[in-house]
Amino acid sequence: MGDLKLQINKNEVLRYLGYKGQDIDENIVNLIEECREEIKKIITPRFIYEYKDIIQLDEAIEVVNTKLILYGKDIKEHLKDSKKCVLMAVTLGNDVERKTRLYEKINLTKALILDACATTAVEEVCDYVERIVKEKAILNNKDITFRYSPGYGDLPLDVQSSFLRALDAQKKNGLTVSENNLLFPRKSVTAIIGIINSGSEKKIKSCKKCTNYKNCSFRREGEICGD
């Protein structure tokens, strides 16, 4: 994976565990450090990303030379200044899921911590891909939007199947989708990044557009889950 070096940011791990500034038992602190190191050994990060031309339709975005149609007012607004986008798919592989299930049987606390570490890891891989796309855009006097995933805003999760086919993701990095539109391996992410002209107005990710807005524990505590 080139220069990809995951940190497994401790503060992010704590946030996913619901940490709100309370005192943490030393045993838990040690377990977190143990899991941060263990997750690096058991994950196999893989990612693909491809540049695609897009066409603005009346109520959707067509991704050229694919069967992927992105429906929704939010994604239309997100990509309104874009003629190209990047489709990306990231996964940590199956081993992390197997290890987490094992710990669920013998040490539930460790299973929860390892899961939080895995969530942190997949987001760090996504950040890495986004940085690559950003750097390439700058070289061409372009810029990018923030990454936008199916399930965010009014972009339905049922685009996942077409999304994976557009990238040939099952063949390239083993990603599949269930009949309920869940990605497998479970610690996987798909996202869209718009390519925009340098100096274009950049949109800010809004919690109110998230499908989990009403139930989000981060928001209730005055925090956000993204940049």
Residue ranges and their predicted role:
Residues 27-30, 34, 120, 124, ...:
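Conserved active-site and cofactor/substrate-binding residues in soluble primary-metabolism enzymes
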Residues 140-217:
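Short terminal or interdomain "cap/linker" segment that borders an active site or interface and mediates
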Residues 41-52, 127, 139-143, 216:
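Intrinsically disordered or highly flexible coil/loop and linker segments, enriched in small
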Residues 107-166:
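Internal, well-folded beta-alpha domain core
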Residues 223-227:
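Short cysteine/histidine-rich metal-coordination sites, predominantly Zn2+-binding motifs
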Residues 37-44, 134, 138, 168, ...:
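Generic secondary-structure signature for well-ordered alpha-helical cores
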Residues 1-114:
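Active-site helix-to-loop segments that bind/position phosphate- or nucleotide-bearing substrates
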